[in-house]
Amino acid sequence: FKIISFLSTIFLGFFIISTTIYSIYMGFGPMSRKLKDPFEEHEN
């Protein structure tokens, strides 16, 4: 049981870190130029 819990902890940590890196990449990476900024569009 110790090996299974050890591997699941590593897998969960890797999953959280990869999701965070992916969200930062989607927010600030090359795809961010296609995203529209709602504050820039709303000018009076």
UniProtKB/Swiss-Prot annotation:
Pfam families named among the record's database cross-references: PsbN (PF02468)
InterPro entries referenced in this protein's UniProt entry, alphabetically: PSII_PsbN
Listed transmembrane segments: 3-23
Annotated keywords: Chloroplast, Membrane, Plastid, Thylakoid, Transmembrane, Transmembrane helix
Record GO cellular component, one term: chloroplast thylakoid membrane
Domain of life: Eukaryota
Localisation per UniProt entry: Plastid, Chloroplast thylakoid membrane
An individual GO BP term: photosynthesis
Membrane topology: Single-pass membrane protein
Keyword Electron transport: no
Family statement: Belongs to the PsbN family.
Function: May play a role in photosystem I and II biogenesis.
Protein name: Putative protein PsbN
